From Swiss-Prot:
It is found in: Cell membrane. The keyword rRNA-binding does not apply. This is UPF0397 protein VPA1481. Pfam families: ECF-ribofla_trS. Coiled coil: none annotated. It is a multi-pass membrane protein. Belongs to the UPF0397 family. InterPro entries: ECF_substrate-spec-like, UPF0397. One of its GO terms (cellular component) is plasma membrane. The chain crosses the membrane at residues 8-28, 41-61, 72-92, 110-130, 146-166. Keywords: Cell membrane, Membrane, Transmembrane, Transmembrane helix. Signal peptide: none annotated.
Length: 182
């Protein structure tokens, strides 16, 4: 795998923003060891703008940074889950034929964005929950309650924040595209 300097810088910035935005002081506690955090909007944005590989690495490295600085130790199962969330949301550009880059973002694209966010959260953190029960002998009901709350909460957060950000990105791309065509 050969990453360009631009891609490495984008991953570093995204991971740092995710890592900081994931700290407990910025989150809303909703269940045992479970918080809704603005970092998820950062992950979604970087995934949509730069694709699945960047999304995976921003989620994986960013969650690792959060866990390191939060002081509760690195939970690799949930670090992996965040990477998977970024990977799945990162499929958005190719599934929409890169319409966002062309300045187009319609309600069908928004619906796809929300579905990818939900699938990413369910599958990514579903893997985390499953691995927690096997590797760490965490109670099944606890981790799947965490999964349910996180999947719904993160999807709502990503949908609300993402709508406004992606509308703005589309508008900016459309304006800059019009300037180059003239």
């Amino acid at each position: 795998m050969n990453l360009s300097a631009k891609t490495v810088v984008v991953i570093a910035i995204g991971a740092a923003l995710y890592g900081i935005g994931g700290l407990p002081m910025f989150g809303i506690p909703v269940f045992a060891n479970t918080t809704l955090k603005p970092a998820m909007a950062v992950l979604a944005l970087f995934s949509v703008l730069f694709g699945p590989l960047v999304g995976f690495l921003v989620g994986f490295i960013g969650h690792w940074v959060t866990d390191l600085f939060a002081g509760w130790g690195v939970w690799l199962t949930w670090v992996l889950g965040s990477g998977i969330v970024g990977l799945i949301i990162g499929l958005f550009p190719s599934l929409t034929r890169y319409r966002l880059e062309k300045g187009d973002f319609n309600m069908k694209d928004f619906a796809l964005f929300v579905v990818l966010a939900l699938l990413g959260n369910v599958f990514g953190y579903g893997c985390s929950a499953f691995l927690d029960t096997i590797l760490y002998a965490e109670p099944f009901t606890k981790v799947f309650t965490q999964l349910s709350i996180i999947a719904i909460g993160n999807t709502i957060l990503i949908a609300i924040v993402g709508f406004f950000i992606l509308k703005s990105v589309a508008k900016r791309n459309k304006q800059s595209r019009n300037l180059t065509e003239a």
